[in-house]
Each structure stands twice: as structure tokens, then as C-alpha cells.
Amino acid sequence: MTTRLSQQADAHIVDRAAALFARHGFAQTSVQAVADAVGLSKAGLLHHYPSKQALWDAVLGHADALGSSACDAVAELPLGRARDLRAVELLADVALSHPGLVALLLAPATRGEDEDPELGPISDAALRAFGVDPSTAEPERLVRVLGALGALAVLALAASQGGHGAAWRAHLIATSFDALGHARPRPDLEV
């Protein structure tokens, strides 16, 4: 039980840190700001993560693990509608559960900056879940997948900020899936 609580605490710390890194950048985010955001003293936070760099590394590691997990979960599915739907479902659940990480991945686009090179492999994992390699993908497919991911990210952040995560999940998935260009299923079937 203690291990699970510790893991939940670490996940909360990492997600809040990611949100602050997204908003202020690594250099402008202080350990004290993260501690305040998670309700710990600075010393308490440093007990979990001995430095700001260790916290940053934990954010990157957690994001990488989530992306790899999503890729692994769809790897055996053939490219196409079923894989795309499963990838959207998995990534929607990740985005709704980890809004700070989503904000961090969106930060370069929202702040008009170049992407942090350390975030590139994490962003690429989302594309790989759809079987897309940006260097070789057909332009329409790449644009549709990027559009689906953009819709998913923005809607997940809005849902999280408004406390609508569970209520919006199905709509978030349907909207993101629609961007991929697959024919809508019959109205009597769930997406």
C-alpha cells in the first residue's frame, strides 16, 4: 500500500512539475514553485527528487514510459482503423490522466519556440502509435495524425481544467478519431 501511495505521489509531483516546466520553462521553474504546487516543503520535495534536474529527468522518463506503453499496446495490431481507434483511446487516457505532460509537449507550439530536443522522442512515440514516421509518411496521413493528436491534446487539457475528464472522454476520442478520416461507424455503435 505504501509503495502504491508513493507511486501516486511521485506521479502527481511529476505531472505538476511538467505543467510548471510547460508554463515557465525549465530555467524559470524553481524547486520551490514545484514544492508549492504539490503541497510540500522544498525539503520534502528534495527528499523525492534531489535536484531540479532529477525532477526534469523524472518528467522525461515518465513521459517516455507512457509513450512506449501506448506503442507497445498497439504494436501487434495491423495499420488501419482498429489500430488508430485503439491508439486514440490509449492516448486519450494518458492525456486525461497526465495533463501536465500534455501541456509540456504542447509548450513549444503554444509559446512559439523550437521543440526541446529531449521532447522529440516522446512526441515521436505518439506518431509511432499510429504507425507514422514523419520522414516517410504520406503528407495527408501525417497531417491527419498530427490533427488528431492536436485535437486530443487541446481537448484533454480543456477537460482537465474544467473537471470534465470522464464526461468528455468519449467526445474527445470521437473528435480525435474523426480527424484521422475514417468513416464514422453506424450511429448505434460506440466509437
Describe the role of every protein-language-model region.
Residues 61-67:
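Short, basic, alpha-helical segments at the C-terminal edge of helix-turn-helix-like DNA-binding modules
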Residues 58, 69-103:
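Hydrophobic alpha-helical connector segments
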